[in-house]
Amino acid sequence: PDGRDPTAFPFAKVDYEETIKGKPTKQKIGFIRNIGFGPTPDQEVLKLCEVAVKVFEQMGNEIQDVVPPFNNGDLIQAENFYQTRTLAELDLLSSENREKAEVINNWADEAKHYSGVDHYRDYLGTQDLRSRMFRAMDGYDFLLLPTVPFPPFAAENPGLDDGDIFSPWCNTFVFNLTQQPALSMPCGKTSLGLPVGLQIVGRAQDDIGVLKMAKAYED
């Protein structure tokens, strides 16, 4: 841990390679097909994730569907918050370095029109997302959901083909807010050969549990 970081956890001497060996005990797992905001999940992506979830069920885990915890208005508020934060962080860079991030600059520039009250309202919105995500996980040991709910966009694009660069994060950014451990496992390819990932999310500080579940799936 870094002494300058008050959120850092104490050092834990763990041999992860040894610790994650062995089949995990039966767990209660929630499956989120649609988190509630962002683009409508692609059916081909969902089918691949459903096949992967069956593997966890065959291991003896209890699988339950989770009702979408969010709605599209939540995503707008979250994006506004991150635009404002990014704008402030970009202001710390030299003009030379800032010019290297044209896409992010253009995206964050929208926040120049937001007021201080707007920003704090958006901040409170992200805290509400955090609370609702914890409530959605209540009673589950792990959550499973598509890492990205649609196939990869064109490699030369910074985001979706319509210019939306925030929606690709819709299934992942909330776990930065909650500080839950999460990882993405490959779970197949679309008919066009594009990779699809299944995200495994654990309870706060249960990094080992997430790694165990991932290894069990991989094996």
Question: Model-derived features: where do they sit?
Answer:
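Structural helix-boundary/capping segments
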Residues: P1-I32, G38-P39, C49-M59, Y120, ...
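Short glycine-rich anion-binding loops that position phosphate/pyrophosphate groups of nucleotides
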Residues: I35, V148-P151
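Short, surface-exposed loop/helix-turn segments at secondary-structure junctions
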Residues: A8, Q77, Y82, R121, ...
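Short glycine-/acidic-enriched loop or helix-start segments at secondary-structure transitions
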Residues: P41, L75, F153-E156, L194
